[in-house]
């Protein structure tokens, strides 16, 4: 992979976190993501699902800051993202899954439903909507949501989303 391709892939991942587009990742981006999801799915912030989503967003931010905010200014710059989030997590993808899981679980609950075992599941269409409201382009959201439905039953389980998100942010590979 040439450096231009690598830079482009990193830029996409950075932009996915930088929800307000001000060129750094901070707590406000995670809160913005939570707010967008709640609005899209008509869920109030002041309910169990809404609170779980904000709690998950805060945990995700704290985890991201712990890994990538090298200078401790409560902002993750592009340089910090590349050096910390991408390089360090590449060696430990399980760590990313761990910090992202509470947010993803809560997001899927907002978009879908909670199973009796506490895990969450959503339809392919709902996951596509969630990805679009978080800034993914239409075709990207559609392709990504479709590929998450590995058994083709029209629904996507929490574990599949966590694994896919962890892989997306920790494994930067050339296009096939
Ligand atoms: Ca931002
Ligand atoms: Ca920083």
PLM feature spans:
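Short helix-capping and inter-helix turn/linker motifs at the boundaries of alpha-helical repeat units
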Residues: 1-5, 55-56, 98-99, 134-136
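The feature marks the first
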Residues: 1-50
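Primarily EF-hand calcium-binding motifs
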Residues: 7-22, 51-73, 101-119, 140-158
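Amphipathic regulatory helices of Ca2+-sensor modules
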Residues: 25-45, 76-91, 121-135, 157-171
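Well-ordered, non-transmembrane segments within structured domains
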Residues: 81, 85, 97-104
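Solvent-exposed, charged amphipathic helical/linker segments at domain boundaries
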Residues: 90-98
């Amino acid at each position: 992979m040439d450096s231009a391709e690598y830079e482009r892939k990193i830029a996409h991942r950075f932009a996915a976190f930088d929800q307000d587009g001000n060129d750094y990742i901070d707590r406000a981006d995670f809160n913005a993501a939570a707010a967008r999801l709640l609005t899209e799915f008509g869920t109030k912030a002041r309910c169990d699902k809404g609170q779980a989503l904000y709690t998950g967003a805060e945990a995700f931010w704290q985890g991201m800051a712990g890994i990538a905010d090298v200078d401790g200014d409560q902002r993750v710059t592009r340089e910090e993202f590349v050096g910390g989030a991408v390089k360090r997590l590449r060696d430990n993808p399980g760590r990313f899954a761990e910090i992202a899981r509470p947010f993803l679980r809560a997001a899927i609950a907002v978009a879908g439903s909670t199973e009796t075992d506490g895990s969450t599941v959503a339809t392919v269409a709902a996951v596509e909507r969630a990805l679009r409201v978080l800034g993914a382009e239409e075709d990207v959201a559609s392709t990504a949501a479709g590929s998450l439905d590995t058994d083709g039953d029209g629904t996507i389980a929490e574990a599949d989303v966590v694994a896919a998100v962890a892989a997306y942010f920790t494994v930067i590979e050339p296009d096939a």
